[in-house]
Amino acid sequence: MFADQQSVQRAVYLALAKLARPSCAAIFEEFLLPDGRSAQSELDRRGMGPQEFVQSLLFVDGRRATACQDGGSVLITTPGSLLIRVCPGFAQVGSRLSATLVIHEALHALGLGENPPSSRDITDRVNRRCW
């Protein structure tokens, strides 16, 4: 167990509740993966829904990760990886943003890269769909 694990559990629970709404789950249709398919098509290929996929993510202590040490991120992953590193400070992020970031990282875990779309664009679009 790591320091922010309870905060992660709360964020995942709230993200799952939001993804139960079709309008929020539709975020996976909005983003295209590098091969041109939607994130939803990757979920379909895996035989999973958004909620089931979020539950498959593995959250681990990321305090030693270089990207966490710069202080600019609270969750990090590599596109296509189910491993999400939790940076110090995640517990200080509000519940709405923390759940949004879980969904944001789920999109990366399905293969979505960044720049483009920017990290802010991903987060803003998740916010619009899910809140």
What is each PLM-predicted segment?
Residues M1-A99, A109-W131:
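Predominantly extracellular/secreted Zn2+-dependent metalloproteases
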Residues E105:
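Walker B catalytic acidic pair
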Residues V102:
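Substrate/cofactor-recognition hotspot
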